[in-house]
Amino acid sequence: MFLAADRPTTDLPADLPAAIAALKQELNAVILAHYYQEAAIQDVADYIGDSLGLSRQAAAADADVIVFAGVHFMAETAKILNPQRQVLLPDLAAGCSLADSCPPEAFAAFKAAHPNHIVISYINCTAEIKALSDIICTSSNAVKIVQQIPVDQPIIFAPDRNLGRYVMQQTGRDLVLWDGSCIVHETFSEQRLLELQARHPDAEIIAHPECETPVLDQARFIGSTTALLNYSLNSPSREFIVVTEPGIIHQMQQAAPEKTFIPAPPQDTTCACNECPFMRLNTLEKLYLCMRDRRPEIQIPEETRLAALRPIERMLAMSA
């Protein structure tokens, strides 16, 4: 497999943001970046958002080239929605622990063991899992989508068990959960969170629903990255403990410089485990190189793409 990281980084232009802007014009490209990307990438992106927002931007894109600064499943989603456009990912190794926790063959067997269930899959999954699903959801719209399903219709929810438990709690529905999780959101602990809050008693705890239940129980507000951003801007509080990947704090600080945003620490204080190692594989240098060389490019077999497109389109229609 060819990786952006395999290329030499010599002869890079001195002003990478300017060079990226020039390439964007030359290629008629649009740069989409997730909130968890490093600040330098966010600063050159055309659109910054969560999975739902970026899916909508990808669906509406009129550029010839979509450069996706995120992880592999996000770039796949852009390609599923835009088969006629070139979709580039700065580093093909930028995967996802949650997506990896749900192998297609095992999930197909799991689905077969639960006949008459519809499958709602979190967008953090591979194209193959999307193709096995009936509806896709994001952390922004998962509750809303489940609420639209008839109460007598049994549901499989995959692949994130923590988001699934949160949806069950919010909707009162019983869901059959696939046992997957995100390594970043599982690194937060209730004990470390309470210790931090004791040092910042006026801070509001805001958390992503991929966190485990004991952590969510301590949160004043639970929501997607976009919801966390909006809540922090509209809340009268001046200090927040942010329990998700800390890349989102860049946008929070830019939007509300008068407020203080404290990243929640991981359970293991010897590592930066609250940072997504896959998201951080993308760098400004790799972004430039992928645009310059127009690779690595996302490719999806057409049969898989068409099967994965239908549940994404259902999500977009149900969350309009």
From Swiss-Prot:
Protein EC: 2.5.1.72
Q: How is the cofactor bound?
A: Binds 1 [4Fe-4S] cluster per subunit.
Query: What's the top EC group for this one?
Result: transferase
One biological process term from GO is: 'de novo' NAD biosynthetic process from L-aspartate
Residues annotated for iminosuccinate binding in this entry: 34, 51, 122-124, 139, 208-210, 225
Q: SUPFAM superfamilies recorded for this chain?
A: NadA-like
Q: Which family does it belong to?
A: Belongs to the quinolinate synthase family. Type 2 subfamily.
Q: What does this gene product do?
A: Catalyzes the condensation of iminoaspartate with dihydroxyacetone phosphate to form quinolinate.
Q: What is this protein called?
A: Quinolinate synthase
Q: Which gene encodes it?
A: nadA
